[in-house]
Curated annotation (Swiss-Prot):
UniProt record similarity statement: Belongs to the glycosyl hydrolase 110 family. B subfamily.
Identification of the protein by name: Alpha-1,3-galactosidase B
Species name: Bacteroides thetaiotaomicron (strain ATCC 29148 / DSM 2079 / JCM 5827 / CCUG 10774 / NCTC 10582 / VPI-5482 / E50)
Enzyme class: hydrolase
Reactions accelerated catalytically: Hydrolysis of terminal, non-reducing branched (1->3)-alpha-D-galactosidic residues, producing free D-galactose; Hydrolysis of terminal, non-reducing linear (1->3)-alpha-D-galactosidic residues, producing free D-galactose; Hydrolysis of terminal, non-reducing alpha-D-galactose residues in alpha-D-galactosides, including galactose oligosaccharides, galactomannans and galactolipids
Keyword rRNA processing included in the entry's annotation: no
Function in brief: Alpha-galactosidase. Removes both branched alpha-1,3-linked galactose residues of blood group B antigens and linear alpha-1,3-linked galactose structures.
SUPFAM superfamilies: Pectin lyase-like
One Gene Ontology MF term: alpha-galactosidase activity
Domain of life assignment: Bacteria
EC numbers, comma separated: 3.2.1.n1, 3.2.1.n2, 3.2.1.22
Amino acid sequence: MRTFLSLKTCLLSALLLCVNSIAASKIISVSDFGLKPDSRINAVPFIQKAIDACKQHPGSTLVFPKGRYDFWAQHAIEKDYYETNTYDVNPKILAVLLEQINDLTIDGNGSEFIMHGRMQPFTLDHCRNITLKNFSVDWEIPLTAQGIVTQSTSEYLEIEIDSHQYPYIIENKRLTFVGEGWKSSLWAIMQFDPDTHLVLPNTGDNLGWRSYDATEINPGLIRLSDPKKEADKFFPAPGTVLVLRHSTRDHAGIFIYHSMDTKLENVKLFHTCGLGILSQYSKNISFNDVHIIPNTSKKRVLSGHDDGFHFMGCSGLLKIENCSWAGLMDDPINIHGTCSRIMEVLSPTRIKCKFMQDMSEGMEWGRPDETIGFIEHKTMRTVATGKMNKFEALNKAEFIIELSVPLPAGVEAGYVIENLTCTPDAEIRNCHFGSCRARGLLVSTPGKVIIENNVFESSGSAILIAGDANAWYESGAVKDVLIRNNDFRYPCNSSIYQFCEAVISIDPEIPTPEQKYPYHRNIRIMDNTFHLFDYPILFARSVNGLTFSSNTLIRDTTYQPYHYRKEGITLEACKSVVISNNKIEGDVLGRIVTIEKMKPSDVKISKNPFFKLKK
């Protein structure tokens, strides 16, 4: 009898738990709070009320009936955030803020979220298990503009601009774009092919026309001239589409901050004020069917103002599948940490440090019990590790770290610190890296990285594995990278930007690289297809364990060779390099392998008569 009663009690308890769970989780519609689609009213205050209701029901889904929703800065929450690779413009204006919320899904049902003015559409702050899905984000007036060349002479450049989509004024002879609560002047131009929407080859960061006089010939027709002969002009052909860069990177599109288990599904960002999706000090992030691409219904070739997916100081697994990017003004993906310099040793357990890059200032660099690497910046050698006991900010640029044990012998002012706890694994599959300014995928993390089954059509290098403590201070020596079954197409590396030494560029900034202290290790490039119009295929500096094998190299003649490197593979201060069993189709140009600061015996070329080591 006791056994029967005990079983009955357990079943009743389980039933009550299930009922309570169902009662706690529910579907909540923004329409319950008076917000209707296509009403053109400010959605911000209504959504704030809906989110407050969701807090009372963990596991809820907040749904938007399909339609258009508009967001203005009025009623938006304003809060200071120090966002990496973003200028310190605070407070941030937050259209939708999720703060300390767990177990919530936001389902847009295919809705359009239209922003007005400078703002951050979504912010996730100390959240867990949040899913955002089924919506698009765009701006009524983008923070980047576009035009078409109508005339190009040795004296001037005429540009046709849709003044409804990109309102402008001429102010002090500068072409100045205006929007809701902002104005900013043209400071750079990118050139796109009007038919393919690819960045025109060998244009890249052509910084001409920074000094100019602007005049309006007719409404929507602007002439840039150079009476002082200071503009360093270039002359794109009539019909060329120009992305007219202005404004600054001051808000992310989606900011994921100190959050865990975040998912984005079926989301399109047609524009952002700065970085597209910025994940900072967050863990376990999954993006599936997420796209940062031009809004073709508005005849745009431009999309985001800067990077696409940017991950700094993250951990756990970054899983990126079935995503695409095009028309960005910076890299589609960048994964890295942040180095800081030791300015002063205050005691055996206390060091004063400084953010050396202004777009890193203000961040919380670390937390108790996290592991620190100590780096000698000239060779980029990690000489020791330690544990952090306390982080104390002195100001936006400087901070004090208290260590759990005394500083390792030999570490002194001038050394650099790296957070080794905030280093993620990454899986990037079935994605399309379309034509954007700069490179395709930047990865700097010691975690396990798999890059497979992707298509690359980047303007610069398709993949950059960097890391430095001397310029950008973006840390992360890789230890396990597999690049497999990808298709590297023209226009990969058809324009030169920083670090674009080859289609795949392994280019850490090391002032004095030494082969006995390799920075990166265990990089395998296998079973890929390269469509090559130029010589440089692979550049690698300071790698221990580099394999380039079973790839198919196909000659492409879409554009003529232009790159200053005339070798296929360039190796510097590397060891244990294997080049083998690669298939050649057509008269591929880059057959020479050059080495520097290493011996011929450090490279093994086998089953591959095509590649020849330069003596």
